[in-house]
């Protein structure tokens, strides 16, 4: 588990904080320190093993917290607003680090946040909760395009549709034999906007190596300016 407050022990070094869960489990010192060194390197803190928390920045302290949660090799990784106490630049950096670790480790992750933009950037599926009850579970695109309740609609009202709508959602059937390029079916409009807008020809929409439709600049612009 990783929490909003890092809860590092101030009298312990980085390696001692990271190895602490293994110490509690009774793992031998040489084994727990070897494992701690592995995850310290994994989260980008190699060379800071003997630093105390007061010698680390906020982002570095959160990396120690992340390393500590990974040292026991959990099957389920639970993060409760882990980046909300960080300033915007460091927060973005930690989100990038989170994505890198997820791509590397392939763990099941439950990530708690009040920031919907953070949720759509990090999550495959999102559960929107109100008063302790789940209002809707869906992928980001479905939450924005087909909200199940008024609360979900209001919660997602201000999100940029270009961040969640995918090429396959607004593509049209193949009509021409001249194209400006290809885009993935699951790429968001934000990701393909520059590529498609800059071409006078439509782009093929691809899935598993097959052409499933086309998308042109007018369809992309409609989403960018908020026209359905």
Model-predicted segments: where are they?
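ABC ATPase "signature
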Residues: 137-138, 146, 214
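The conserved cystathionine-beta-synthase
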Residues: 178-210, 214-228
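Short coil-to-helix segment of the ABC ATPase nucleotide-binding domain corresponding to the Q-loop/switch region
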Residues: 12-19
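Catalytic Walker B motif of ABC-type/P-loop ATPase nucleotide-binding domains
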Residues: 77-80
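Conserved signature/switch motifs of ABC ATPase nucleotide-binding domains
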Residues: 51-54, 72
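Conserved ABC ATPase "signature" region
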Residues: 19, 23-26, 30-48
């Amino acid at each position: 588990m990783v929490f909003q407050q890092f809860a590092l022990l101030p009298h312990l070094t980085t390696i001692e904080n990271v190895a602490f869960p293994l110490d509690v489990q009774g793992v031998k010192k040489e084994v727990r320190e070897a494992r701690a060194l592995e995850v310290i390197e994994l989260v980008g803190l190699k060379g800071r093993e003997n630093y105390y928390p007061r010698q680390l920045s906020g982002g570095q302290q959160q990396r120690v917290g992340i390393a500590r949660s990974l040292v026991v090799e959990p099957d389920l990784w639970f993060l409760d607003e882990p980046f909300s106490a960080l300033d915007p630049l460091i927060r973005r950096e930690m989100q990038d680090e989170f994505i890198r670790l997820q791509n590397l480790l392939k763990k099941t992750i439950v990530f708690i946040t009040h920031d919907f933009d953070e949720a759509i950037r990090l999550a495959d599926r999102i559960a929107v909760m109100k008063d302790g009850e789940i209002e809707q579970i869906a992928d980001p695109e479905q939450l924005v395009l087909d909200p199940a309740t008024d609360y979900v609609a209001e919660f997602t009202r201000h999100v940029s549709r270009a961040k969640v709508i995918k090429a396959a959602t607004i593509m049209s059937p193949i009509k021409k034999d001249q194209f400006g390029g290809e885009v993935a079916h699951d790429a968001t409009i934000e990701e393909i906007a520059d590529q498609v807008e800059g071409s006078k020809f439509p782009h093929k929409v691809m899935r598993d190596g097959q052409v499933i439709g086309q998308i042109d600049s007018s369809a992309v612009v409609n989403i960018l300016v908020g026209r359905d």
